[in-house]
Amino acid sequence: MSANTDEFDVVIIDTGCANLSSVRFAFERLGANVLVTDDKASIKAAKRVVLPGVGSAGAAMASLTEKALVELIQGLTQPVLGVCLGMQMLTLLSKERGGQALDCQAHDCKCLGIIPTEIDELNSQTLKAEGLPLPHMGWNQLTFSNPSQVHPLFAGVEAGSYVYFVHSYRAPLSDYTLAQCRYGEDFSAAIGKDNFMGVQFHPEKSAAVGAQILGNFLKMQ
């Protein structure tokens, strides 16, 4: 049954393959009313939508397909925030293998196709040369190509601020990069197009900086 979304500040999509509690609690600590659901009517009517995700792109996309949520998400017009794998799912495709339902063990995984960039693995040769392990796990710094004109998602966030990452795949720098980070190579720490935004890091695990970013999202209409 559809919930009355007027009473909720954020609807988190229950993708079936994500640990949703930490994201939910992070918003609730900011005073937000949060609904976690896979109900299509509730998602469509939401004020703001969060797309979380952990695991492989193939498994996550298979779950969205099984729940008949792909076209619905593609057509959303309210602010939408993808977190970690949720960010990667907003792109054209991921080169990450895994997910038999979409035959992603042998082929690139088709994603939601909303933000025109592609996901590939962090450069293992570069990481090895610099003595850096894969996955990229831990705190790292955000930078902005134009610090005087940051995206509203990063209002009040200073260049050089630390956020928490856990990932092996990344979006390259592009015209859709909102913030970047360096780990063996420069990559997109956040991407966006129109009402869709995604962050590769975990704002719910990124202390005060993460809370600022989630708070900025709550202000978006």
Swiss-Prot record:
GO molecular function: glutaminase activity; imidazoleglycerol-phosphate synthase activity; lyase activity
Any single biological process term in GO: L-histidine biosynthetic process
Active site, renumbered: 84, 202, 204
Compartments it resides in: Cytoplasm
GO cellular component terms listed in the entry, alphabetical order: cytoplasm
Catalytic activity reported: 5-[(5-phospho-1-deoxy-D-ribulos-1-ylimino)methylamino]-1-(5-phospho-beta-D-ribosyl)imidazole-4-carboxamide + L-glutamine = D-erythro-1-(imidazol-4-yl)glycerol 3-phosphate + 5-amino-1-(5-phospho-beta-D-ribosyl)imidazole-4-carboxamide + L-glutamate + H(+); L-glutamine + H2O = L-glutamate + NH4(+)
Keywords: Amino-acid biosynthesis, Cytoplasm, Glutamine amidotransferase, Histidine biosynthesis, Hydrolase, Lyase
SUPFAM superfamilies the record matches: Class I glutamine amidotransferase-like
Subunit structure: Heterodimer of HisH and HisF.
Function text: IGPS catalyzes the conversion of PRFAR and glutamine to IGP, AICAR and glutamate. The HisH subunit catalyzes the hydrolysis of glutamine to glutamate and ammonia as part of the synthesis of IGP and AICAR. The resulting ammonia molecule is channeled to the active site of HisF.
Protein's name according to its UniProt entry: Imidazole glycerol phosphate synthase subunit HisH
